[in-house]
């Protein structure tokens, strides 16, 4: 998908003259449209389409500033998307993660208890989100409530864990 986006966004344009006596206003460094070179049109000679294409390639190509900004934006978004994708764990995968974090036997609860809790609260979905009637949200695998434990930018919330819910 990313390669298709890059292919669609690779907008190359032909170079245009820096200034032209017949054009009013500030000189344009790059034209975002396709045009024949001014040397060909000023000479009065007629060229075929293939001759124009060959000469256009020889003149060099430049990026349109709007295309550069669009490419930068798409690059930034493509870097951020994989980090925001939801992770849905398998039962064994979640058990390994919880064991690595030392939750087996934590406060008297076995690893099976933690896995059972995660299954029935979120279905092992790390991005699970449930809205309560009071406006608070239950977040993540263990459905931590934003009313007391985390902040979802609601004013006057205790935020005991001192972290954002997202």
From Swiss-Prot:
Gene3D superfamilies, alphabetized: 1.10.530.10
Bilayer topology term: Single-pass type II membrane protein
Region span, Disordered: 16-54
Free-text description of this protein's post-translational modifications in UniProt: The processed form derives from the membrane form by proteolytic processing.
TM region positions: 63-83
Residue stretches of biased makeup (Low complexity): 16-52
Site (Cleavage): 86-87
SUPFAM superfamilies with a match to the protein in the record: Lysozyme-like
Keywords: Cytoplasmic vesicle, Disulfide bond, Membrane, Signal-anchor, Transmembrane, Transmembrane helix
Cytoplasmic face of the membrane: 1-62
Pfam family, one: Lys
Cysteine pairings via disulfide bonds: 150-165
Cellular component annotations (GO), alphabetically ordered: acrosomal membrane; sperm flagellum
Entry's Gene Ontology molecular function annotations: lysozyme activity
Domain C-type lysozyme: 87-166
SMART domains linked to this entry: LYZ1
Location(s) in or outside the cell: Cytoplasmic vesicle, Secretory vesicle, Acrosome membrane
Function field: Sperm surface membrane protein that may be involved in sperm-egg plasma membrane adhesion and fusion during fertilization. It could be a potential receptor for the egg oligosaccharide residue N-acetylglucosamine, which is present in the extracellular matrix over the egg plasma membrane. The processed form has no detectable bacteriolytic activity in vitro.
Family: Belongs to the glycosyl hydrolase 22 family.
Complexes and interactors: Interacts with ASTL.
Alphabetized PANTHER family for the sequence: LYSOZYME C, SPERM ACROSOME MEMBRANE-ASSOCIATED PROTEIN 3
Protein's name in the database: Sperm acrosome membrane-associated protein 3
Organism, as annotated: Papio hamadryas
